[in-house]
C-alpha cells in the first residue's frame, strides 16, 4: 500500500517517538523530509539528522529533550494533499505570537516563516512547530 502523505508520516513518527522517550527515530527518506529536518535542526528543535545509504535511503532524526521533556510541544501538519494551504508573503502565519515556527515550502526552498518574510516570498505552509 502506498503512503498518501509522507510528510505527515514523518511528523507522526517524531511525535510518537518523543512521546515514549526514544533518542532517535528512523523513517524512509525524501528530499522534502531532509529539508524539513534541516530546518528543525537549524532552529534547535532536534539534535541532528543523518541519511543512510543502505539499500533504501533512510532518514534518522536525533530527538532533543530538556529536563526529560521533549523540546517539541506541538508538531502539526497544516497543508495536506486533500487541502493545500498557500500563503503570500504578507499572510504567512505566526505561531504562538512568534514563539514557534511555521515551515514553508517556497520557490527558494524550504524555510521558516521568518526567513520567508525576510526573503519576501510566500509559499505552501507545510507544518507548525512549537
Curated annotation (Swiss-Prot):
Q: Does the keyword Repeat apply?
A: no
Cite the entry's keywords alphabetically: Ribonucleoprotein, Ribosomal protein, RNA-binding, rRNA-binding
Q: Name one GO biological process term.
A: translation
Q: GO CC: one term?
A: ribonucleoprotein complex
**What GO MF terms are annotated?**
rRNA binding; structural constituent of ribosome
Determine the domain of life of the protein's source: Bacteria
Q: Cross-referenced Pfam families, in alphabetical order?
A: Ribosomal_S8 (PF00410)
Q: Which InterPro entries match?
A: Ribosomal_uS8, Ribosomal_uS8_CS, Ribosomal_uS8_sf
Q: Is Transmembrane included in the keywords of this UniProt record?
A: no
Q: What does this protein do?
A: One of the primary rRNA binding proteins, it binds directly to 16S rRNA central domain where it helps coordinate assembly of the platform of the 30S subunit.
The annotated subunit structure for this chain is: Part of the 30S ribosomal subunit. Contacts proteins S5 and S12.
PANTHER family, sorted: 40S RIBOSOMAL PROTEIN S15A
The UniProt similarity line reads:
Belongs to the universal ribosomal protein uS8 family.
What protein name does the entry list?
A: Small ribosomal subunit protein uS8
User: Could you tell me the gene encoding this protein?
Assistant: rpsH
Amino acid at each position: 500500500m502506498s503512503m498518501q502523505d509522507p510528510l505527515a508520516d514523518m511528523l507522526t513518527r517524531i511525535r510518537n517517538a518523543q512521546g515514549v522517550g526514544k533518542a532517535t527515530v528512523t523513517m524512509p527518506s525524501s528530499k522534502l523530509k531532509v529539508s524539513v529536518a534541516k530546518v528543525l535542526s537549524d532552529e534547535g528543535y532536534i539534535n541532528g539528522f543523518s541519511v543512510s545509504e543502505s539499500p533504501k535511503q533512510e532518514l534518522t532524526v536525533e530527538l532533543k529533550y530538556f529536563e526529560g521533556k521533549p523540546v517539541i510541544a506541538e508538531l502539526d501538519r497544516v497543508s495536506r494533499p486533500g487541502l493545500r494551504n498557500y500563503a503570500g508573503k504578507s499572510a504567512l502565519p505566526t505561531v504562538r505570537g512568534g514563539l514557534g515556527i511555521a515551515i514553508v515550502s517556497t520557490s527558494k526552498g524550504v524555510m521558516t516563516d521568518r526567513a520567508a518574510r525576510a526573503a519576501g516570498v510566500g509559499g505552501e505552509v507545510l507544518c507548525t512547530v512549537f
